A protein has these predicted regions:
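N-terminal positively charged helical leader segments and presequences
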Residues: 1-85
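Short basic, glycine-rich beta-strand/loop surfaces that mediate nucleic-acid
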Residues: 62-73, 139-145, 183-194
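RNA substrate-binding interface of SAM-dependent RNA methyltransferases
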Residues: 33, 87-177
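Gly/Ser/Thr-rich beta-alpha loop segments that engage phosphate groups in nucleotides
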Residues: 11, 109, 143, 195-198
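Active-site/ligand-binding-proximal alpha/beta "capping" segment
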Residues: 169-199
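Short secondary-structure boundary/capping elements
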Residues: 5-8, 101-104, 195
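Conserved acidic residues
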Residues: 24, 119, 188
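Glycine-rich nucleotide phosphate-binding loop and flanking beta-alpha elements
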Residues: 14, 34, 58, 76-78, ...
Length: 199
């Protein structure tokens, strides 16, 4: 079973259920007496459920599963053509990640992007964090709510954004203004660099 098809943790599985993610099966610790709201939603959606010993969950994932694991279809990503269509639909605020490879960091960034109301996240096909269970859990399920555009080269996406008169600004850890406080123009996208090298 591919790690990218596994999600775990109560909040993550609940968010998947709320967002109509295609869930194949849910595994719950048979000794867990809680999670009634999750169990109810699983039954409502006629999803296969299996009550298993904790050891089974530990074998399915090394992450902090909190007594629940689910298998899902891979997270769908979009391409450069889809990005262009999104811009045509008046979406201008994107977060562009340049070589962010840590799964937990990526998940946390996705969560922040959703809070900021970004229209999507742009990553490259190579040199970017995989979208796996750890990423999904770190995003607290936010990854189900925000489009992820995966492109061959980041520069192609930036060129497309600029061609549509979208301003590109960069995030810097030494910057004086918090991203939460800064007032962006309507047509602004943000580039964020990697953990080690930056942009």
């Amino acid at each position: 079973m591919s790690e990218s098809n596994i999600i775990f943790g109560k909040r993550t599985v609940f968010e998947a259920l709320e967002n109509d993610v295609q869930i194949d099966k849910v595994y719950i610790d048979r000794d867990n007496q809680f999670m009634e709201n999750i169990k109810r939603k699983v039954h409502e959606k006629s999803i296969q459920i299996s009550f298993v010993p904790i050891e089974k969950l530990n074998r399915l994932t090394k992450g902090n599963h909190q007594g629940i694991v689910a298998t899902i279809s891979p997270i769908k990503t979009l391409d450069l053509n889809s990005l262009e269509k999104s811009i045509i639909d008046n979406n201008f605020n994107f977060l562009i990640l340049d070589s962010v490879t840590d799964t937990k960091n990526f998940g946390a960034i996705v969560r922040t992007a959703e809070c900021l109301g970004m229209n999507g996240i742009i990553i490259s096909k190579s040199g970017s964090s995989p979208i796996n269970g750890e990423t999904i859990k770190s995003s607290s399920g936010a990854i189900f709510n925000i489009p992820i555009f995966k492109v061959d080269h980041i520069k192609d996406a930036i060129f497309l954004l600029k061609a549509n008169e979208i301003k590109i600004v960069s995030a810097d850890e030494k910057g004086e203004n918090s991203i939460y406080d800064h007032k962006f123009d309507r047509k602004t996208s943000i580039v964020m660099g990697s953990e080690g090298k930056g942009i």
